[in-house]
Amino acid sequence: MSQTKPRDVQVLPIGTNTTVLRSRSWTRLRFEIEYALAKGTTANSYLIQGDKLALIDPPGETFTQIYLDALQKRLDVTEINYVILGHINPNRAATLKALLEIAPQITFVCSNPGAINLRGVLENPDLPMLIMRGEETLDLGKGHNLQFIPTPNPRYADELCTYDPQTEILYTDKLFGAHICGDQVFDEGWATINEDRRYYYDCLMAPHARQVETALDKLADFPTRLYATGHGPLVRYGLIELTHAYREWSQQQTSADLTVALIYASAYGNTATLAQAIARGITKAGVAVESINCEFADPEEIRAAVEKSAGFVMGSPTLGGHAPTPVQTALGIVLSTATNNKLAGVFGSFGWSGEAVDLIESKLKDAGYRFGFDSIRVKFKPNEVTLQMCEEAGTDFAQALKKARKVRTQSVPATNVEQAVGRIVGSLCVVTAKQGEISSAMLASWVAQASFNPPGLTIAVAKDRAVETLTHTGNKFVLNVLKEGNHLGLMKHFLKPFGPAQDRFADVATAEAENGSPVLQDALAYLECSVQNRMESGDHWLVYATVENGKVLNQDGVTAVHHRKSGNHY
């Protein structure tokens, strides 16, 4: 078994008087849904050394000691004048506290919401601070006259980008990143990491695509050679393409036919983490999300989002046995604005009790709203199973909205083309996959051999399938080929609706493949596969995988085949 590389800090000059310090974790760092591809990550920090020294975005608590060690090897930290913060959270606060102990002379530079957060997490109302609202500059000398661009969104209301005209580097914090760890500092061969960037966008940016478009408009005013991102490779070679992609992905969200208003507040970040996973489930099903942090939103913004939405989901922590005041205010707006034919959902985290979720749920039930998923209550921090449940709940919510719209739309006969496409037949199979504590499965008939050497195949996976999360490049799965004559039982089992995070393999005879995925013991044959790449194909992903192992379990059996008459459904 290969050993995991230890966490470290990679240091490299990236421009005139400018250095990156990349704190690297080679394994999955956190349980948030954005890290689910499990390719590790980097927390990128930057040092600009003009006549004065500025440090940008020190990493979170995981890297505190190794980061400060690396920093002290390269300079006297008492010479640092400024620490510029793209956003502030409790995780980053641990590093800031440790830095202040050895460099108490520091002045912090942040947005106005960031200043409020910073004073709170550091428990110091008298911190020396420069607040940047978008018009101020900070002259470090030697041409490094920094400019600041507030780019707030519901998840990061304090988001602040920094631009250095001397190097034409734009420090983008959460924008344009990816959770990948490697030796490559820049994005040479950028097309190979597009999948990771798209996943990062879908998890972090899609729920507030409107604010992303506003940020892109602001950033377009600055001639830029390099995006100095908060995570993953720095963007130099594919900068134009990635900027265009962010535009396209955001426009897909803002022009969607159906929208869900996701309204929440978060005390310690746990409810926000749940909101992010639910939003990911909704958007992957082709429904847009308007994310609103009601701690920072004005009543009219909440009212407008609810009015235009097809449904709404509310999330709240429980503080002192109650929902926070901003949540109670938002609930009042929802009850007075949303007609009760809109679909509703409720979620929240708590420490000792969960009265906030109960309160919201009871108020909505009394008002006659239907629920798109059972209310979600999570004690303390969510884990990967909890986040899978949240993502699948979001997908169920979106599918219910789409189904309701479809029912209202008059069905039309299949066209000649659709009837012709329906004559394409495919083997009946079940895709099974397991990653950590998460497992999933789906019935599949859009399967084809794709290569002889290496032996490879393609599978079309609908974007809103739960198993889609486990079919990214590098993932492993098993393709179970069903046997004619005994396939109906397995077919019916895997066609039935499953609840969020429900065990797909209950009452099914399985064994474990070498790659860790379940093998159906009643299958005709099975193939152990490794995903090499995938292509976006309309409402599906076309997944290409190579076959690493396999076995025929019944030499006399015949493959079950799925016959259709229309190509507009399965």
Curated annotation (Swiss-Prot):
Residues 260-402 form the Flavodoxin-like domain. Its EC number is 1.-.-.-. The keyword Magnesium does not apply. Binds 2 iron ions per subunit. The keyword Transport applies. Keywords: Electron transport, Oxidoreductase, Transport. Residues 38-231 are annotated as: Zinc metallo-hydrolase. InterPro entries: Flavin_Rdtase-like_dom, Flavodoxin/NO_synth, Flavodoxin_CS, Flavoprotein-like_sf, Metallo-B-lactamas, NADH_oxidoreductase_modular, ODP_dom, RibonucZ/Hydroxyglut_hydro. Residues 421-570 are annotated as: Flavodoxin-reductase-like. GO terms for molecular function: electron transfer activity; FMN binding; oxidoreductase activity, acting on the CH-NH group of donors, NAD or NADP as acceptor. Its cofactor is Fe cation. SMART domains: Flavin_Reduct (SM00903), Lactamase_B (SM00849). By homology with NorV in E.coli, may be involved in nitric oxide detoxification. In the N-terminal section; belongs to the zinc metallo-hydrolase group 3 family. In the C-terminal section; belongs to the flavodoxin reductase family. Mediates electron transfer from NADH to oxygen, reducing it to water. This modular protein has 3 redox cofactors, in other organisms the same activity requires 2 or 3 proteins. This is Putative diflavin flavoprotein A 6. It comes from Nostoc sp. (strain PCC 7120 / SAG 25.82 / UTEX 2576). The gene is dfa6.
